Amino acid sequence: MKDLLNLLKNQGPSDEFDGIRIGLASPDMIRSWSYGEVKKPETINYRTFKPEREGLFCAKVFGPVKDYECLCGKYKRMKHRGIICEKCGVEVTLAKVRRDRMAHIELASPVAHIWFLKSLPSRIGLLLDMTLRSIERVLYFESYVVTDPGMTTLEKGQLLTDEQYFEAMEEFGDEFEAKMGAEAIQQLMKDIELEREAQEIREQIPNTNSETKIKKLSKRLKLLEAFIQSGNKPEWMVLEALPVLPPDLRPLVPLDGGRFATSDLNDLYRRVINRNNRLKRLLDLNAPDIIVRNEKRMLQESVDALLDNGRRGRAITGSNKRPLKSLADMIKGKQGRFRQNLLGKRVDYSGRSVIVTGPTLRLHQCGLPKKMALELFKPFIFSKLELRGLATTIKAAKKMVEREEPVVWDILDEVIREHPVLLNRAPTLHRLGIQAFEPVLIEGKAIQLHPLVCAAYNADFDGDQMAVHVPLTLEAQLEARALMMSTNNILSPASGEPIIVPSQDVVLGLYWMTRERVNDKGEGMIFSDIKEVSRAFYSKQVGLQARIKVRIDETIMEESGESESSYRMVDTTVGRMLLWEIVPKGIPFEMINKPMVKKAISAVINFCYRIVGLKATVIFADQLMYMGYDFSTKSGSSIGVNDFEIPEAKAGMIERADAEVKEIEAQYASGLVAQGEKYNKVIDIWSRANDLVAKSMMEGISKETVKNKQGEDEEQASFNSVFMYADSGARGSPAQIRQLAGMRGLMARPDGSIIETPITANFREGLNVLQYFISTHGARKGLADTALKTANSGYLTRRLVDVAQDVVITEQDCGTDEGLSMTPVIEGGDVIESLGDRILGRVVARDVIRPNSDEILVPAGTMIDEKWVERIESMGIDEVTVRSAISCDAVFGICAQCYGRDLARGHRANVGEAIGVIAAQSIGEPGTQLTMRTFHIGGAASRASAADSVEVKQEGTVRLHNIKVVARESGELIAVSRSGELALADAAGRERERYKIPYGAVITVKEGEQVKGGSIIAKWDPHTHPIVTEVAGRVVLAGMEDGLSIRKQTDELTGLTTIEILDPSERPSAGKDLKPAVTLVDENGNELKLANSEQPAHYMLPGKSIFSLKNGDTVGVGDIIARIPQEGSKTRDITGGLPRVADLFEARKPKEPSILAEISGTVSFGKETKGKRRLVITPPNGAVLEDGSTHYEVLIPKHRHLTVFEGETVAKGEVVSDGPSNPHDILRLKGVEALANYITNEIQDVYRLQGVKINDKHVEVIVRQMLRKVEITGMGDSSFVKGEQVEYIAVLQENEKLRAEGRQPARFERQLLGITKASLATESFISAASFQETTRVLTEASVTGKIDNLRGLKENVVVGRLIPAGTGLAYHAERRRKREDQAGSKAGSDTVSAAEIEAALTEALKSSAS
């Protein structure tokens, strides 16, 4: 019997599915979903509140209003289940079928679906090859369209106005057919022969020349192919039957007072039904054509409004003047179905309350109020009460719990034991915003939170609230404990640094106890061990900060994991010994034997985690906290006004600055300096004064002189509370102290520019009215910024999560040896990020080889941990190629090797880790700390004057990077290349400094030369751009005629004559074609050739250049022929902060981007046009370019400053004209790696300025997603269309297949999409639709019959399955395996016959009847 029932069950549809397909519904399909037709616009009877028959809420069509009860009341109860009442026609079943039973409306005339008409690009328009305007004219009954031309001169699809139609009727009679309205459009679409049309277009494309035409044709071809492949029929874009939403999804609720609250959809449906019925009646009456036509148009409009109100014409409004919410509005936007109900749901078994500190808790605990716990764990308590026999039924158990009997509390204790709960604080900006804790029952009503996890939650105790959630199933509890427990989340996933780090009071306490105090009680005592020290301290024989000697037992952990301990005598203080008591074995004493500022504490915790392990670290962190609180209490440290000591020298400094400013004002008044220069100088003076005041204030506050044991003066760090707060990193910073005790300094206006009157007072002295006003002026902007910032930052995070949500680690190793080459980030003389920091936790892509030999230092595939970093730093390696997400070859997701270390755990990433979301959160979470403002270069910002030399900071060896030089006779080198760099390496061979060297700079050192720190090794004139000779010879001038192409000037003081070349625009017409040039010849007058090339030494002189040689002068190598004055490049605002990050990720083109050379070759200038210069690049040796031309031309606006001049050679991708970089150009000309480096460095610059650490690999994951599309440039033998956008991986796979078959692969170009575009271009339509532009995405997906394979996380959340990441990845893999096994076994088993099913049915019915 059971087998038979199982057999029946197995025949039904299964819940297992692996994809969702969206398509167009045919009219028959709509009717097949329907349970009946809605014929009347009535909803419910206002007296009886019963639904009207055949109305919008009809019980006969949609099902009963009450469970198992028909409308007239004849059948009630379960036993009549399935019977249809003969009186009212209602099926007796559950009332919830009213949530899924649909109905339909038979439309009297077909109606075009507005989505396919108006959602751009219009699908109907594309298919019929008509403009949207003309289709609308037909649909809304303004024109006729010819549907069948017959044997006439008319064409199919031609529009006719009324007059033209009547004329044609007279001329041709019934030969042709023309219609209007949706019927006409439907007819035209029925007549399309998809296959033939597609074939015709395929033949047309190769014979078409114009780009736009090809684009148009390929768009149409794609659409036609989509229809052919998906099995959708074009005529289904016109509705014949309109589906009606189940009534419980558009409810009508009676309010008190006899009014009803209703969903807007009911209004919209009523309109459609009314018009439809009226149209039916008019058609039955054979009404005049014009009336019928009008009614049809109104029907079309009312269906449009139902589907997407406001898409065409004015939106239909309700009684409250608001537009009605149509079906399209129900699914889109933050309040729509996707974001409100599918991606974000409310959760049962949860509660929220205010949080307070729990300084006595352990790290894995939280205090849960008893009242809350009782409510949250109710079901567990009920089952326990029943199990123990304390309550007979659930109802009795419920009563016991409500009465709060004593036994209930005992049971609650048991239930809660080791049952973790999740705590969440909104906004949840990264994954550490939800962590698991073990609850500890407490009295009161507030949740207690462990202070160390506040940093992760970004929580404080000023009234923040948190939510508690209970994981119910055993698996959920297990995951909460193993993965989400606060003790397992010590490191931040963004940077890999500890995030469980003491702050504020705790830091202060630890700092205070580890400070030294000169001549404290018991100084100089010697102790044998820790115990003796603590006995002496607690019996008050020795002060906490006394300097003493102690014999300690120190354990050092070896790399191999062995540890060895040793005894030694150390100089230390009592407080440090007390701290040493709680430090785990394996940490060297040196890490503790210093004042413990916040950074030092963080370093200890980090070291402890890496060397000693997780468990010890957690215990240690807790002990640190308890001890810190204890001693910060004991320190009694507090501040009063007198702690802010104002330096005596302040008044004098301000007076001096004032005097300087007055002097400049006087110069300005007499016209010696310009307005801008005065402003900059004044601001410079005040910034300097402010720094000096701050310096003397910090000196006064941070040191104090005391008498020591010997009675001599000794200087020690001050015990001033304010200084201690700032020095320890507990609270405040020198900048804040400066405002309290120094001077407030310069203030900014809301637009970011600096006010030149500074505030000379500080907060201790108090501000006067003017000063107060100046402060508020810029401060208000700050507050407004903060509000905007939060929203913008949230939106950035949302876009990032959306673009990266489907990146999961899917395999161990993809086997590529590609990667990014990593070098230290050096700006000028500072190493901003060392190579070690950049490659830590990455996998080496290719063997690292010792310079100048073939010894392998680091084999490929090595994961670089802290030990390796030390080794690599000591070997003097400068560059390592590491595996990267960008170059990973995995088809879906990324492999573990390319990703490297899981930052939050410190070991190689596991398969299933959702790295995309982690990357998005790591970049988005600090977003609120970034600024919103654009910095104006002005005042304090522009103090760096134009550099004119390179001064090295430390000694080292000089290295030249792609600098072309010529040597003068004196031995100096002159740079004759643009993008050259000069670097300084230390003794180990690591680069420590790096400087850009401009063209024409004089370099006084050679490659490999040793230089001392402070020596100047290169200099140049920042205001002119020289033209340098590369060979020696005699000068021959050409094309120089005074007054036509040049102007002579004689300096009155020196009597020297200089020649200025006139700009072509300033020359008289006779001189336009003259090309002033200098040619170098040898003694015999033969032209000299440049070294290593066949080109003559011929230097063109550009306009505005100044030149002082005469015919026949001799010049040496490296001499300057002419100088071109540089106008100061315009000061640009630098966009900083959040807008800059958004610009980079959206891959926006800057306003005036730098222009790069498209090919390598020689530069020359062609004929100028009005306002533009023509730059011509000729490839060397007469090579021919891909498009068959012999050179490359580009027009550049005249106002752009060019960095190249005539006759110079440039390399592909070199900058020709300055400006902000355009990432698309970098990708096209320099490749993926250069682009990755550019975006990573630019984004890191923004975050570094705010002191935020983010690992490079997060940015790389996002960049990988931005690069996932390519544009097809050549079709080859593939099925792709030229100009279409395809997934990179898809093209690679297709090309591999084609190569294997020996056919022509497709050619393509990588494309860079901004994150919004990339999210919308994802393969999954569910993910794209739930992100933005829902209507457009769904329209496109349904026309092309897209299948969503549910690969990403978002799609799976929407359809309510486990996500394919973490434990879900294994679950899905297992499911797939099972299904494949079943498919294999099923093929062998025999099929079920109809007879067997019938037998089983009768059997089953008998058993249920008995």
Curated annotation (Swiss-Prot):
EC number: 2.7.7.6
Gene Ontology molecular function, alphabetical: DNA binding; DNA-directed RNA polymerase activity; magnesium ion binding; zinc ion binding
A GO BP annotation: DNA-templated transcription
Record's keyword terms, sorted: DNA-directed RNA polymerase, Magnesium, Metal-binding, Nucleotidyltransferase, Transcription, Transferase, Zinc
Residue numbers binding Mg(2+): 460, 462, 464
GO cellular component term, pick one: DNA-directed RNA polymerase complex
Family that this chain belongs to: Belongs to the RNA polymerase beta' chain family.
Protein name in the entry: DNA-directed RNA polymerase subunit beta'
Organism of this sequence: Saccharophagus degradans (strain 2-40 / ATCC 43961 / DSM 17024)
This protein's encoding gene: rpoC
